């Protein structure tokens, strides 16, 4: 196995771990994204960042394998369903680099 394959495997594992974490530890975010992208059955989270002030705010990137699109997201959670806010912005993949999303080279493995 060459170093590039190993690197891609590590990056793939990072994507899968991040997606698993969000789906189990931040289920409101996962549910909100699924509701916003109802025709997407394969969604993967990357670059998950949690607000350090305990405000239940999260941001990062989502890869929608169904449409081969990447979205930047911002999510503000709340105990009250009415106050949850999700912002999704589709990003032009061709303009992204590994400085934006470290896992970018591994997307083809999903």
Residue ranges and their predicted role:
Residues 52-59, 65-106:
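Phosphoinositide-binding peripheral membrane targeting modules
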């Amino acid at each position: 196995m060459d170093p590039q394959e190993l690197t891609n495997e590590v990056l793939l594992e990072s994507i899968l771990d991040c997606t698993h974490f969000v789906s189990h530890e931040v289920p409101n975010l996962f549910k909100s994204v699924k509701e916003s992208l109802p025709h997407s059955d394969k969604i993967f989270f990357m670059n998950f960042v949690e607000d350090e002030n305990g405000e239940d705010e999260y941001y990062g990137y989502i890869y929608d394998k169904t449409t081969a699109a990447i979205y930047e997201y911002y999510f503000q959670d709340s105990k009250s369903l009415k106050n949850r806010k999700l912002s999704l912005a589709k990003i032009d993949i061709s303009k992204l680099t590994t400085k934006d999303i470290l896992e970018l080279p591994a997307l083809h493995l999903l």
